């Protein structure tokens, strides 16, 4: 994409103040219109402990062929811009006055007053458009961020995450799943990780299982790859590989949230080191150099979003049943990142968390010789799996938690098997013995034998 249109916009900034005006979307490849967020202080991982990412406030700006201006000049703060699929409307998180909590707002590109979408006692941030006039965003409840969706026109919100970890949506994938960042806990550390969930809250899973790296601020590119920040640099997930792949980009630190132009180049936030401010740069993947677009010595310039139309993601028809609980079928617990001796796994325990955050046992069920088990679990609560040997000793216990929606029926290839693993073409022994799941809903903490 030619940079002359960008430069023309930049030169015109000197003559412009922060006044409201109509925004022009990019009509083609000969111009570049975009939004970005400016903030003195930016902590991209503050959400992990329910804290403020913009401790000194933030402002969303528009840069188009007319110049630059604040998106909503009369707001005390604005951030997290997102463009509708038709390119005609914008979502953003905003505060009308400094003492307000963050709320989700929508404004038309053609002009007019912003419309408040949420009324959250605490903050609602990071909004994104979903198909069928719905949105997804993060809501803070008791100092903890959870992801939920709601109709644009108002109505009852639907929680999508039910674990104890904080979570923040970052993109809506073309297949309809919601990409979000949350915490991954291991025995030694807790790091941000990339996850997906369907728009009804079912099917939650980590995007890749090579955990341990600091990963956040992920977006889907035109190729279908997921572009993310990993330990300050850029990396990607691609369908052909089960592990993260590095992106050979110019040295420095990246803020993520890339914006890809129709020609495949990236508008992104970069800084030379941790003591510098993020500035907007233009980069063609594979090129040796970044090209400056916009910088401010006292502000971080982040969250670039192009003002362009884009395809509507696939709609997700929910497969949830009208059942009071959920069913979980594991085909083979030996299929795992962890190595288990043949015949060593004899039973499985399931835990949730009580009101104080302590683990509470829901029940114990047998594991068959082929590693299969079939259990009915409590829904919309944190769940944690523990595998035991014949003496009741722990072989492996999850450090984190997952969840299942009411009426969800889920089949797992194994225990933390990874997306590259396919199941054996065989009926699991647990179903040959009984199609009745073992009761692990917490009605009792006794051993649950199901149909055995």
What are these regions (language model features)?
Residues 449-452:
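Long, low-complexity, intrinsically disordered segments
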Residues 1-9:
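Bacterial N-terminal signal peptides that target proteins for export
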Residues 3, 16-19:
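Low-complexity intrinsically disordered segments
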Residues 4-5, 22, 447:
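Positively charged, low-complexity intrinsically disordered regions
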Residues 8-17:
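Bacterial N-terminal signal peptides
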Residues 23-370, 376-382, 393-414, 419-431, ...:
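Sequence signature of WD/YWTD-type beta-propeller architectures
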């Amino acid at each position: 994409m030619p940079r002359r249109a960008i430069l023309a916009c930049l030169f015109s900034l000197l003559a412009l103040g922060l006044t409201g005006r109509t925004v022009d979307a990019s009509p083609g490849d000969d111009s570049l219109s975009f939004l970005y967020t400016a903030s003195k202080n930016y902590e991209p991982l503050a959400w992990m402990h329910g804290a403020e990412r913009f401790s000194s406030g933030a402002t969303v700006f528009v840069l188009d062929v007319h110049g630059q201006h604040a998106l909503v000049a009369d707001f005390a703060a604005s951030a997290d811009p997102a463009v509708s699929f038709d390119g005609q409307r914008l979502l953003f998180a905003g505060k009308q006055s400094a003492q307000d909590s963050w709320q989700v707002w929508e404004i038309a590109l053609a002009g007019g007053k912003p419309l408040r979408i949420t009324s959250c006692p605490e903050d609602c941030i990071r909004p994104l458009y979903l198909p069928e006039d719905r949105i997804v965003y993060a809501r803070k409840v008791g100092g903890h961020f959870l992801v939920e969706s709601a109709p644009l026109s108002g109505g009852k919100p639907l929680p999508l995450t039910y674990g104890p970890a904080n979570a923040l949506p970052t993109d809506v994938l073309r297949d309809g799943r919601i990409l979000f960042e949350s915490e991954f806990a291991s025995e030694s550390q807790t790091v941000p990780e990339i996850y997906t969930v369907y728009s009804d809250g079912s099917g939650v899973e980590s995007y890749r299982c090579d955990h341990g790296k600091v990963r956040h601020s992920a977006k889907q590119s035109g190729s279908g790859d997921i572009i993310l920040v990993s330990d300050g640099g850029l990396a990607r997930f691609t369908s052909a590989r089960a592990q993260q792949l590095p992106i050979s980009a110019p040295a420095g630190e990246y803020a993520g949230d890339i914006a890809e132009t129709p020609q495949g180049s990236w508008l992104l936030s970069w800084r030379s080191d941790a003591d510098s401010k993020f500035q907007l740069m233009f980069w063609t993947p594979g090129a040796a150099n970044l090209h400056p677009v916009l910088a401010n010595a006292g502000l971080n310039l982040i969250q670039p979003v192009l003002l362009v139309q884009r395809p509507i993601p696939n709609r997700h028809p929910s497969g949830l049943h009208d059942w009071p609980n959920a069913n979980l079928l594991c085909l083979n617990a030996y299929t795992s990142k962890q190595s288990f001796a043949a015949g060593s796994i004899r039973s499985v325990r399931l835990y949730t968390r009580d009101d104080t955050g302590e683990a509470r046992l829901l029940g114990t069920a047998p594991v068959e010789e082929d590693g299969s088990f079939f259990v009915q679990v409590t829904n919309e609560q944190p769940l944690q799996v523990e595998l035991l040997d014949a003496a009741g000793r722990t072989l492996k216990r999850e450090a984190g938690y997952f969840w299942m929606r009411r009426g969800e029926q889920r089949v797992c290839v194994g225990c933390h098997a990874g997306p590259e693993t396919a199941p054996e073409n065989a009926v699991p022994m647990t179903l040959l013995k009984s199609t009745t799941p073992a009761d692990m809903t917490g009605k009792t903490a006794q051993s649950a034998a199901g149909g055995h």
